[in-house]
């Protein structure tokens, strides 16, 4: 069979073991000069070495197991959603498809097996002349109502279906700017409807919105979403809420949207989660069904023709059905039903948190922003005024001058060059610190280069006695700290929307359930979990403008040592339970358990207590707790008093 496998040399034996028995062919190990091949390197290797060799060997099909190499050979390649899709190389010489590395079978064998089956089935079908691109022909019934009457009739016809998948397309990812571009419903993997709603981001179609709201309020079946935390947040705000903090509208919307729903993203998470992680996106989970149907301009739906947008929206809901059918059985088989039910309850809290947002005192935020900008400029000034940076800047200019003069007849002088040190460049920082200043390399990056992050710089401060170097390192640390806040967080704070009703600004973000292997919440736009916290130089500055509007109270709740409570209840360990039943300090108890030899005074005191007799825990009427020795007169007095009343 004229099939070529392009793989990394170290993967050859695994490919021969796992894959070659299913689909015979020839292995062509790729040449790697580093940890990862660049597209330019891949292109050069293909054009100067592989192409002629493949032609000579009469190869017709390529199975490429390296994403960068695949991108070099295929136009507009998206490897993760083109597994098992037969493409043509840019030069038209070969048919090609992408397959993940066989090494992935060691940490996620079922996933690799599934994807490899897609690959070899696609190649076999293409050779036999029966291949169809994924996604071709999946829409057997696509209804696209245009007029108000057609939309009303289409929505009425949906009431007969017990389950519907649903998806919306919006003008923005921010719910308060999103509008409602279009919506789609499907009753199986091949049949559904999709229709336009708002004409533009600023022009609402109130009549269609009214019909949609009435349908959701009266539909008795189950609505299935992929990531309902986004769709429901947008729909609740756009259909039920009259302002950013219309509490009645918010609660009404929550009741209707979450009365009977499923979320295929959570189902996928529970069915596929492993230590190696997983891809939860709808496109990634349905690529073998729908293919790569992503629209290039989906971030701005105004650039997509209406017919294309509606077909795209419909494909989303058909794919949601596919993902539901693909994973719901696995989730239930793995006894994850109760966990799923718990996650569904949590989604209600997440959606409400996303709609409520964080109150921001804009006047104070602007004041803090001004101070942060000043801190950034101060740090830059300290960096550029440092004598070692001045010397390095001169070196940069000399290098630029020499490079120019080597290739030009008309020579330039040093005054013609204004190169300056760039503190945002890891390469320049590494050259300055490790080559010029000869500091020791205490940490390296993933690519084995000397690290220049703040944790590394903090270590380096103690590795030199030169005060100018210490000052420079501290200036770097201060600069990075403040720049991160100024570029990542402050733009979000300063641009957050104003609520006319409460006369206050609010910051809104997205929370993701199932976005981590551990199950912890994750956050984006902005990442609220990375806000400067206790211990950070700017924690108090940020907290100073997170403030409730006049007449309101902003409060926070947190579990007290939640993990320790759970551990004590699950293990029934007497010492762990004693922390809560007898009022011990958990940290002290653990410290003594681990390091008894370091605490002879405590050991001696415990020995003396044991000699004196048993210890009793006494809880007084006011709730206070006291531990008394059996020979303590106070204990005897308490016992005598207690006996009088029994």
Description of each model-found segment:
Residues 60-67, 165, 220-231, 554-556:
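Acidic beta-strand-to-loop metal/phosphate-binding motif
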Residues 1-133:
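A polyanion-binding, active-site-adjacent surface
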